[in-house]
Amino acid sequence: MKVEIYTKDHCIWCDRAKGLLNAHSIDFEEFDLSNDEERFQFYEKLGDNVKTVPQVFINDQRVGGYQDLRAWLNE
């Protein structure tokens, strides 16, 4: 399973989402949107419609934010 999470510095929901993934022993790749290059890739992937973080993708499908991830893990 390929998991990507887009985050920003000082984001409590980002920290919680990463904690949730870790609690389920799910490896993930983190992209920090505080970094200009990673932010550009994010907007290239999603457009500028999504403005909140975290954003989680599983196998290249957008799951959404923290609450969406929680719901996905409980399915």
Regions found by a protein language model. Name each.
Residues 24-27, 45, 71-72:
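Non-catalytic interaction surface on structured domains
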Residues 58-75:
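Non-catalytic, surface beta->alpha helical segment in thiol-disulfide oxidoreductase systems
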Residues 47-56, 66-67:
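Structural micro-motif
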Residues 12, 37, 64:
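Short alpha-helical
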Residues 15, 19, 40, 71:
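Alpha-helical elements of the RecA-like P-loop NTPase motor core of helicases
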Residues 33-50, 75:
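Thioredoxin-like thiol-disulfide oxidoreductase module
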Residues 1-29:
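Local sequence-structure signature of Cys/Sec-based thiol-disulfide redox active-site neighborhoods
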